[in-house]
Amino acid sequence: MISRDAAATRQRILEHARRQFARHGYTTVTVKGVADAAGVSPNLITRYFGGKDGLFLAAARVEIPVADSIHGDRAGLGARLAASIVQRWLGAHGEDPLLVLQRASGERPEAAEALAAFLDTNSLEPLHRYLRDSGLADAEARDRAAAIDAFVLGVSTRRRILRAELGDPAALEAWLGATIQRLADGLG
């Protein structure tokens, strides 16, 4: 008798779904395609996730401790954030839930809302608080945080969604770090 592990099966389905949604967006991915890739029946996807929408929402759940990268002296903020960003872009290739949300945000309003909520909670607000706590006035801290957030999202969209190459990771990290630092310092 074959033992069944529902948690492992569910995780395998999610891994394949993330990969497919990240590469192809929401519209072209099918329940059958994910089921075939995961080696399961499409009925299991319906049972575990309720269908394609539920599968998408589960695959796009983002939990990234962005705030961990901002602690420290403001003079090193750009370097810390850039290192974290490039590591994520290189390490989560093809399965990054954030990439799933970015790619699907033009197709699905709930993906756009989930991406906006994630960025507000995990990027914009922590940066705003950090910059304010480092001595900037509240409005200035918010403006600089918004500039950093918009810059990183723009670069991510250009490099990951539009499928341009990331290029040399060290050069990318140095450029991102310098640009983020200029924005944090109000020089951008």
Regions of interest found by a model, annotated:
Residues 53, 89, 106-110, 123, ...:
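Short alpha-helix boundary/capping elements
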Residues 1-43, 50-54, 65:
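Basic, helix-initiating cap at the start of DNA-binding domains
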Residues 112-117, 131-188:
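Hydrophobic/aromatic-rich alpha-helical bundle segments in the mid-to-C-terminal region
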Residues 90-121, 162:
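Amphipathic alpha-helical segments used for helix-helix packing
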Residues 56-63, 70:
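Alpha-helical DNA-contacting segments of helix-turn-helix folds
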Residues 79-83, 120, 124, 128, ...:
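An amphipathic alpha-helix signature
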Residues 66-99:
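Hydrophobic alpha-helical connector segments
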